[in-house]
Amino acid sequence: MTRTLDLMVPLLGLSLGLALSLPRAVAADCGSLGRVEHLAFAPVPGTEPTAPRVRAPWPLDSLYGTVRRFLSVVQLNPFPAELIKTLLNDPSSVKTDEVVRYEAGYVVCAVIAGLYLLLVPITGLCFCCCRCRRRCGGRVKTEHKAMACERGTLMTFLLLTTLMLLIGMVCAFATNQFTHSQTGPSVEAVPETLLSLRGLVSDVPKKLQAVADQFSSPQKQVSKDLDGVGENLGNIIHNQLKSTVYPVLASVHGLGQALQVSIDHLQSVNATSVELREGQQHLGPPVQAHRERLLALLQESWCHENCKGALSQASALQLGADFSQMPPVDDVLHRLQGVPEANFSSMVQEENATFNNLPILVHMQMVSVVKDLKKALAEQPEGVRMLAQAFPGSEATSRWSQALEGLEQRSRPYLQDVQRYETYRWILGCVLCSAILLVVICNLLGLSLGIWGLFAREDPSHSETKGEAGARFLMAGVAFSFLFAAPLILLVFATFLVGGNVQTLVCRSWESGELYEFVDTPGNLPPSMNLSYLLGLRKNISVFQAYRQCKAGTALWKVLQLNDSYDLDKHLDIKQYTHELQQELQSFKVDLKDLDLLNPAARQNLEALQSSGLEKIHYRDFLVQIQKPVVKTDMGQLAKELEGLAQAQNESLRRQQLQEEARELRSLYQEKVVPQENLVAKLNPSIRVLESSAPKLQVNTSDLLDIVARLKGELPAQLNHILRNATECFLTREMGYFSQYVTWVREEVTQHIATCQPFSKALDDGHMILCDMMANPWNAFWFCLGWCTFFLIPSIIFAVKTSKYFRPIRKRLSSTSSEETQLFHIPRVTSLKL
């Protein structure tokens, strides 16, 4: 039974292995190579993105909109393109009436300012003379019923006017200081902006070279991956082929075990058959002799009644099985002589070791390929190497730098003058704001003391110091108002004229695009101010188009008129470079000549088994004879019968004969029959195993030989298919590093290095500096100061009117007449000199 299991287990494993060893379609396993790592490229110096210049929010920002709306009412005329064109090209031919017509709103404001400048000081002078002669600004002549209402109304209007002056003065102070604080940084930002633009083209080659040098990053990463590519590819091949190779090797191992077990059984059958035949030849004569003697003895007259059972058994005492009828197996054994010559277990272990060492084998075979790949990898692609040298910017760089340098040099004196005059304006603004503050203080003190004096005075005709002091403070405020009215209106109009024209003529047209349209129209600018030429723009691109394209991130060579066109995509086309690497790697083939799966000795053993005819042996003939007893009768039972008969005999001679026959029969059974029975018992399992396994063994042997032969032809192609897929995966990953570099370079060049965004940013910064940081607070300053200046007039009127009520009222007779009653003087008698 144990021998049967020893053969059935290998056969079951062999059948399963043959089923699993059929070739399968192999899919690419790219995940085993790992993901593409993210390459970190060093930022190129000087390409750090600069945020656009923005103005910090200010609490009085809402005031800017009010000023702009006021200026839009003052200046209703559109942008004077023809007037500016004439002014720039031929200043002497500019007609005054055209200027006046365009500046009509400002002329009206100038007339108003002139009237203010003329009338207010003259009025102040007249009022001063009148006060000196005590004819103006005196007292209330009479007390009447509506006096309290008039006084309250005047004080209310004066207080409101003073509050308006106070608000305007605070806003004027704030805008004056804010304008001064913004002017310095704004003026300093102009040369900084021009200086940054000078390097817009000249610094590009140096930055491009820095970008080209970083091609070493993907080179280093790919070189690092190449160090382990052989082992990685070998692991992929091993993982893909093990589902094919391992079952075949397991089948070979199982078939070797089955072959060994079958030969052992066959040898046992052959040896046992020979012994059985020889033993039966020696057993037949003594059995026949015993039978004849027993029949003669038991058929005598004395044994008619008592010997029927023994006689029946003695009659059956003859050979049962005829072992000479069993077919010979020595011919099959002769064909299997020396089998198994190969050590299948050792062979399978060696093949397993060879297959498991596949990663090392591939690595060793790829050493020369990796060396060649690294040598080719160390070289830079032609396009990347010439990335900086091919940039055609020499002429444009010179023209651009000269234009910006000239503009910077010409602008410095004007910028210094702007700072100097701004300082003067700031000082004068502080002085005049202080004067307005003085007027406000005088008004507030006058109102406070005057009201206090009114409550403290019992009789309106009585003089009271607090009321008198209040009236004097109000008159002092009036004096200061007349005194500072002229410088106030002059400063307001001067700043209004400058700031208003900057806003309406420059900023408004800049925002609407009319300024760009004027600059781009041929003939509007003199030849020396041809911006398209000075900036080196392409002939078909205007300044406004350049601004819009640069704001969108267009590259320099698409906007500037460079020496030659610059094709970035052509320089970043590294397909030729990567194609050489791909071709070198894809041409690699793995040689698996050491992996045989079945060595020649094992193949000969299996072929010998296949042609041995093991399955053709008539095992049924063996079973027919094995199932028969060696002797038909039970010799032990017959011996007992004879011994019983011997005990029943009275005659000693017969008793002795029967006992002797029984003893000899037992002896024959033990010496001849029992060994034959043992041989039959030994032969039975071997025959049954061979009967059931020999056909399967032959089929599996044929299948295994066919599969091994087919795999020997298909395995190289399957291996190369796996290698090709794995190589594609490896190349895809490595090309990903070069793609990262190309993407980074394209983004770096187009968005940071060779982008003309600094040009549009400079224009936006210029608008921010001129209009938002300087013009807006400047205009807010004169607006607030003008507010205060014109509120001085109602302040003067209400202060003069109110001051009368703070002085004592003159007495008059009880009369309803409005005229003052003259006191009657009684004439005195005087002595006359004669």
Curated annotation (Swiss-Prot):
One biological process term in Gene Ontology: positive regulation of cell projection organization
Membrane topology label: Multi-pass membrane protein
Compartments where located: Apical cell membrane; Basolateral cell membrane; Cell projection, Microvillus membrane; Cell projection, Cilium membrane
InterPro entries the record matches: Prominin
Membrane topology, Extracellular segments: 28-106, 175-434, 494-779
Signal sequence range: 1-27
Complex formation: Binds to cholesterol.
Protein name (Swiss-Prot/TrEMBL): Prominin-2
Source taxonomy: Eukaryota, Metazoa, Chordata, Craniata, Vertebrata
